[in-house]
């Protein structure tokens, strides 16, 4: 800057000249595009001395990525690989590792770190389950389940203590569940609610998110009868072509289905069950007000 104002191209030129490897991928992928990097393991096999595995490129964007061998949270080896095809196979010395991890220290800005682990001891469960109280930050080392004690009340169920289990953390996931089993003290039966949702994201489209969900509630509406309410729903979220524009549109379609048991306390049981269709549209824009 003593001679003139430097820019990114000066920085790129210096790095390119000093690097012993081709680093065009860094500027083309990380700097100049919205492309995302996402690798995962497939076809892992191991012996006492070696590990053979394939690395699957989920987005088709190629970049060097480090592979770590971990034993009891200690790094026993680290190897950089440069996948050139959609599925590349490698063999490394095991060095007593009990798991292998892609991008363990997050050195490469990868889109999804939840699929980076592969256990060499437990085939069915790559990441151990960890229970955390209430809301917590994302920890890609574990399959996190959040729990929270709950207490609700209605006249026919009385006090209904329960425990809420969820996998929803701050970062979005494709699949979310929220289950709240409870016990109705007055009725002496189980009750509660649950919700499950699946998200599809479209990175380069104005239709950027489709969300499918279903929720249910099960409680008493009379001393001798329960009701079950089901709520299947689909949402379409749309943004502007200019991604910096905060205007968002949403189309929501849902069906509310209620099934009620017949009750001796209700004089008119001619149509205890019903179903209602609901559609909704919103168009919002969030901006700071001067």
What do the predicted segments below correspond to?
Residues 1-48, 53:
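Amphipathic alpha-helical substructures
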Residues 16, 224, 250-257, 261, ...:
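Large, well-folded core regions of big proteins
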Residues 18, 56-59, 153:
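Non-cytosolic beta-sheet module surface loops
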Residues 23-24, 37-104:
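Beta-strand-rich binding/interaction modules
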Residues 81, 92, 103-206, 244-247, ...:
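Outer-membrane beta-barrel initiation region
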Residues 149, 177-181, 212-216, 232, ...:
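Membrane-embedded beta-strand positions of outer-membrane beta-barrel proteins
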Residues 156, 170, 184-186, 201, ...:
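Structural signature of outer-membrane beta-barrel domains
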Residues 203-218, 234:
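A glycine-rich helix N-cap at a beta->alpha junction
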């Amino acid at each position: 800057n003593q001679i003139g104002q430097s820019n990114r191209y000066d920085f790129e030129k210096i790095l390119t000249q000093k690097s012993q490897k081709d680093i065009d991928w860094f500027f083309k992928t990380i700097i100049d595009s919205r492309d995302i990097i996402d690798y995962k393991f497939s076809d892992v096999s191991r012996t006492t001395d070696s590990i053979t595995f394939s690395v699957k490129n989920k987005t088709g964007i190629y970049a060097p990525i480090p592979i770590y061998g971990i034993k009891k949270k200690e790094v026993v080896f680290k190897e950089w690989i440069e996948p050139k095809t959609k599925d590349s196979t490698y063999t490394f010395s095991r060095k007593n590792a009990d798991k292998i991890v892609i991008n363990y220290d997050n050195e490469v800005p990868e889109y999804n770190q939840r699929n980076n682990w592969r256990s060499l001891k437990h085939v069915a469960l790559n990441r151990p389950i960890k229970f955390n109280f209430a809301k917590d930050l994302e920890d890609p080392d574990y399959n996190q389940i959040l729990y929270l004690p709950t207490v609700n009340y209605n006249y026919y169920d009385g006090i209904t203590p329960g425990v809420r289990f969820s996998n929803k953390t701050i970062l979005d996931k494709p699949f979310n569940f929220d289950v709240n089993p409870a016990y109705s003290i007055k009725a002496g039966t189980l009750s509660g609610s649950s919700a499950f949702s699946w998200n599809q994201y479209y990175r380069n489209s104005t239709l950027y998110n489709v969300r499918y969900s279903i929720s249910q509630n099960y409680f008493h509406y009379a001393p001798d009868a329960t009701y079950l309410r089901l709520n299947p729903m689909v949402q379409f979220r749309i943004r502007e072509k200019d991604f910096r524009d905060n205007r968002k549109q949403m189309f929501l379609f849902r069906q509310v289905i209620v099934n009620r048991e017949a009750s001796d306390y209700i004089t008119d049981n001619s149509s205890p069950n019903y179903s209602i269709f609901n559609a909704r549209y919103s168009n919002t824009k969030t901006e700071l007000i001067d």
